[in-house]
UniProtKB/Swiss-Prot annotation:
Glycans are attached at N44, N58. Keywords: Cell membrane, Glycoprotein, Membrane, Transmembrane, Transmembrane helix, Transport. This is Multidrug transporter TPO1_2. The gene is TPO1_2. It is found in: Cell membrane. Its main location: membrane. The lineage of its organism: Eukaryota, Fungi, Dikarya, Ascomycota, Saccharomycotina. The keyword Transmembrane applies. Disruption phenotype: Leads to intracellular accumulation of clotrimazole and increases the susceptibility to clotrimazole but also to other imidazoles such as miconazole, ketoconazole, and tioconazole; as well as triazoles such as itraconazole and fluconazole. Also increases susceptibility to other antifungal drug families such as the polyene amphotericin B, the pyrimide analog flucytosine, the fungicide mancozeb, and the polyamine spermine. One of its GO terms (cellular component) is plasma membrane. It comes from Candida glabrata (strain ATCC 2001 / BCRC 20586 / JCM 3761 / NBRC 0622 / NRRL Y-65 / CBS 138) (Yeast). The keyword Cell wall biogenesis/degradation does not apply. Residues 1-63 are annotated as: Disordered. Belongs to the major facilitator superfamily. DHA1 family. Polyamines/proton antiporter (TC 2.A.1.2.16) subfamily.
Length: 577
């Protein structure tokens, strides 16, 4: 497989890069597909007379083939343009074992590239960039709903913790393991699913993931003991987490720089709105029935998504699309020589292990750009799951909201929506400057993060210091603070993700998998100590600690705005734009 050199400028909008996929394989758009079937060559070759000195049987056949190709300049079966003379390979058969059965060696075939299929120019309707807008919008909705179902499954379990503690006679931290193990599954699986999607395509990975996710949620809902619940929760997260790494890569497949930022914005909202929306829905479910219906609801939702992906989602991975095109042409023409470049990829077990496990991890710890951005992103993601424990402490224990105590989460969603609109507007400004200057470095994606990095610690400190005094301060005050926190969550997460994708475009799935691996680890760990920290230190001082950490990370986007291009220039994987 080939990839763009890290020292060559890359313009996502440039015609020569229009067909680049977010994978390790490049496809060069071309309008020509030359087909020389071996049976045709033999047929034509048999009409050529041998005018040279006496040759061996094999040499005569080879010479005949070469003469046939030169003498039969004709129209291709595939395109009605004249086919140029192909380059014929010369093969030394002297050291080869016999064919068997007394048969001579077959004639030498032309260069393999003559048979390679490509996209038919930048306007090829087969290319995902050129799919109808209605089709791409439908696929985006399906993929975003898939992400929401996965992330809702992580936090909806929190509203059933009290019932689980009573039924199975365990302390809350044991029940919270149901959340931790689920999110640990998020951390474990993307490093496998994302590179696999670059080898075998997006569709198969998403179909398997959505089916397995629905299956294991039904298993949790029907489990008879706590051990089964915990094991099935882990596998639900492990199998279901593929969209968290594959969906951004699928969006990169379908959209160029003009639209990609907006599509990733929708994905980010799905990742963050799901965990916040789930407790609001779950609180109403547990008020009227048992915790098992929390899992039944997610399982039914996931089943509907599985059906939608199975019947409506088309393969978007560019090299995999060309593989399908080659198979169709072989079937229609009978020419077994037609192939896609991606079909020539032969991976050993070692190479598969490197591409599915070690590469994302190696990238994470050897790429300073990816590591620093991921640490910041992971801290923000951990805060998201920490709030699942902090909000009940403030509003249920402090303000006495024992019924519908999860409603203040809605302020977080409002803040996220406001930030989504802000980033959408900033993306329009990004594109205006992109067209004016003829290109922008990926660091330009970090500008919204500068604002969000300041707003985020304000929201945390506001929430914790006002929520610590429920007898003096009205509940609406810490509730409003949630809008600032939600603004910061999306405003930091989304530019980080866009920056990673723009910087590692050809291997975006692996880069996102590395990011998902670390941030899911943070998301799994934070709920375990959240209760002890807020109850032990007090809501105010726990918030002070988190706020100071958030303040310490404010300079991160500023540093990359200044030093990012130089870091990428020295990178093994990132583009030097």
């Amino acid at each position: 497989m080939s990839s763009t050199s890290s020292d060559r400028p890359y313009d996502p909008l440039a015609p020569e890069n229009e067909g680049v996929a977010s994978s390790d394989v490049e496809s060069t758009d071309s309008g020509e597909i030359r087909s020389y079937g071996p049976e045709e060559v033999l047929k034509n070759g048999s009409q050529i007379k041998d005018k040279g000195p006496a040759l061996s049987k094999n040499s005569t056949q080879t010479s005949a083939v070469e003469s046939a190709v030169a003498a039969n300049r004709r129209l291709s079966k595939i395109l009605t343009n004249t086919v140029d003379e192909p380059d014929v390979l010369e093969v030394d058969y002297s050291k080869c074992p016999p064919m068997g059965g007394g048969r001579p060696f077959p004639p030498t075939l032309p260069e393999k590239t003559q048979f390679e299929v490509t996209f038919d120019g930048p306007n090829d309707p087969l290319h995902p960039f050129n799919w109808p807008l209605r089709k791409k919008v439908m696929l985006c909705i399906i993929l975003c709903l898939n992400c929401i179902s996965i992330t809702m499954g992580s936090s909806i379990f929190a509203t059933g913790i009290r019932q689980i503690c009573e039924i199975y006679h365990v302390i809350p931290v044991v029940a919270i393991l149901g959340i931790t193990l689920y999110v640990l599954g998020f951390a474990a699986s993307p490093v496998i699913y994302a590179p696999l999607s670059e080898i075998y395509g997006r569709r198969g990975v998403l179909v398997i993931s959505s089916f397995g996710f629905a299956l294991f949620n039904f298993a949790v809902a029907t489990a008879k003991d706590l051990q089964t619940i915990m094991i099935c929760r882990f596998f639900a997260g492990f199998i279901g987490a593929a969209p968290l790494a594959v969906v951004p890569a699928a969006f990169a497949d379908m959209f160029d720089t003009n639209i990609r930022g907006k599509a990733i914005c929708l994905f980010s909202l799905g990742v963050f709105v799901g965990p916040i929306l789930a407790p609001v829905i779950g609180s109403y479910i547990t008020q009227h029935t048992t915790w098992r219906w929390l899992e039944y609801v997610i399982a039914c939702f996931a089943s509907a998504i599985f059906v939608a992906i199975l019947f409506f989602f088309e393969e978007s991975h560019h090299p995999s699309i060309l593989v399908g095109k080659a198979k169709e042409l072989r079937k229609l023409t009978g020419n077994w020589g037609i192939h896609a470049a991606h079909e020539d990829v032969e991976l050993s077990v070692k190479e598969i292990a490197e591409k599915t496990i070690t590469r994302p991890i190696i990238m994470l710890f050897t790429e300073p750009l990816l590591l620093i951005v991921t640490i910041y992103n992971s801290f923000v993601y951990g805060i998201l799951y920490l709030l699942l424990e902090a909000y009940p402490i403030v509003f249920e224990q402090g303000y006495g909201f024992h019924t519908n105590g999860e409603l203040p989460y809605i302020s977080l969603i409002i803040g996220m929506a406001i930030c989504g609109a802000f980033i959408w507007w900033m993306d329009e400004d990004y594109l205006r400057r992109y067209r004016k200057k003829g290109g922008l470095v990926p660091e330009a994606r970090l500008l919204p993060m500068v604002v969000a990095g300041i707003v985020f610690p304000i929201g945390i400190l506001w929430f914790c210091w006002t929520g610590n005094y429920p007898h003096k301060i009205h509940w609406i005050v810490p509730t409003i603070a949630g809008a600032f926190t939600g603004f910061g969550l999306i405003g930091i997460f989304l530019p980080c993700l866009n920056y990673i994708i723009e910087s590692y475009l050809l291997i975006a799935a692996s880069a996102v998998a590395a990011n998902t691996f670390m941030r899911s680890g943070f998301g799994a760990a934070f709920p375990l100590f959240a209760g002890y920290m807020f109850n032990g230190m007090g809501v105010n001082y726990a918030g002070l600690l988190l706020g100071l950490l958030a303040v310490a990370m404010i300079p991160v986007p500023l540093l990359f705005l200044k030093y990012g291009p130089g870091i990428r220039k020295r990178s093994k994987y990132a583009y030097s734009l």
